[in-house]
């Protein structure tokens, strides 16, 4: 992943002026850079293709100077984005068909890593991202819910839920763990769904999000509460430091979760933070 973004085709006058100010390079080399255009050919597998260790990802056929000048850009783009796409694919595989949303921008190592990483995560199988810049620039689905601060900014949880449902009538996913998931959050969400049903304003897509606690236990209890209240179509989304191992464990415990928001551990590939691609 990242092969489509690798090649810089020229150096600007400002670039040349800066390089000259370093007093490292001679004038002949700087003049060469001023007129530089990559003339070689690059052969690459399509982005998103599964590859195995020691299998070439990309081949550069060019004069040695041109091939050398693009080395760092190629490795930077391919190593980082292939790392995140690989992590995303592992998370997606663990979820066994449930949707995985990329939620990692706040914990990414900088804005570029957050945006390129979100793009790579979608290539790796995520259904969308909470990174709106990435969604805009690369035409991928923008997805997400609201934050705990939304709830806390209102006088009470029920009022916050009602207002959110009013503002987002087609996709109402309510974050239920701000105060007490089973005694407050889920009951208040059910009450809002009942009110919407009575007013004939049920959203096309609706549900709750769990963001803390024992997700297996809470999801099973919440599922029963929603079903008993007459809302079997309500979806349950889970987040909270998820990765492929935790998702696999939760599913093996019978967790009633329909989709997953995965942030830190995906966007940083926390357990394997570097991809060892080389250029030879």
Language model feature labels by segment:
Residues 2-7:
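Short, small-residue-biased leader/transition segments that mark boundaries at the very start
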Residues 8-13:
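Compositionally biased, intrinsically disordered terminal targeting/sorting segments
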Residues 24, 30-39, 48-52, 57-229, ...:
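Buried, small/hydrophobic-residue-enriched core segments of structured protein domains
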Residues 42:
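Segments forming glycine/polar-rich beta-alpha architectures that bind adenosine-containing cofactors
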Residues 143, 208, 236, 258-260:
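Hydrophobic residues within beta-strands of alpha/beta enzymes
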Residues 224-229, 234, 242-280:
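Gly/Ser/Thr/Ala-enriched C-terminal appendages of enzymes
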């Amino acid at each position: 992943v990242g092969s489509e973004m690798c090649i810089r085709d020229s150096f600007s006058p400002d670039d040349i002026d800066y390089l000259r100010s370093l007093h490292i390079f001679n004038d002949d080399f700087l003049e060469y850079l001023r007129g530089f255009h990559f003339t070689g050919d690059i052969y690459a597998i399509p982005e998103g293709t599964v590859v195995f260790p020691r299998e070439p990802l990309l081949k550069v056929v060019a004069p040695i100077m041109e091939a050398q000048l693009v080395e760092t850009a190629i490795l930077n783009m391919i190593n980082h984005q292939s790392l995140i796409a690989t992590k995303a694919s592992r998370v997606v595989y663990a979820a066994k068909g449930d949707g995985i949303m990329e939620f990692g921008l706040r914990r990414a190592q900088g804005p570029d890593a957050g945006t390129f990483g979100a793009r790579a995560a979608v290539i790796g199988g995520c259904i969308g991202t909470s990174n709106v810049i990435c969604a805009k620039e690369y035409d991928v689905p923008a997805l997400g819910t609201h934050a705990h601060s939304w709830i806390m900014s209102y006088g009470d949880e029920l009022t916050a839920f009602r207002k959110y449902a009013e503002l987002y009538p087609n996709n109402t996913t309510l974050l239920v763990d701000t105060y007490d998931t089973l005694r407050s959050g889920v009951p208040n969400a059910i009450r809002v769904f009942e009110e919407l049903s009575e007013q004939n304003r049920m959203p096309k897509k609706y549900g709750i999000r769990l963001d803390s606690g024992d997700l297996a236990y809470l999801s099973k209890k919440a599922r029963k509460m929603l079903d008993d209240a007459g809302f079997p179509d309500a979806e349950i989304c889970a987040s909270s430091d998820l990765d492929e191992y935790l998702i696999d464990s939760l599913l093996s415990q019978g967790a009633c979760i329909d989709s997953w928001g995965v942030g830190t551990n995906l966007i940083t590939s926390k357990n394997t933070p570097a991809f060892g691609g080389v250029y030879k």
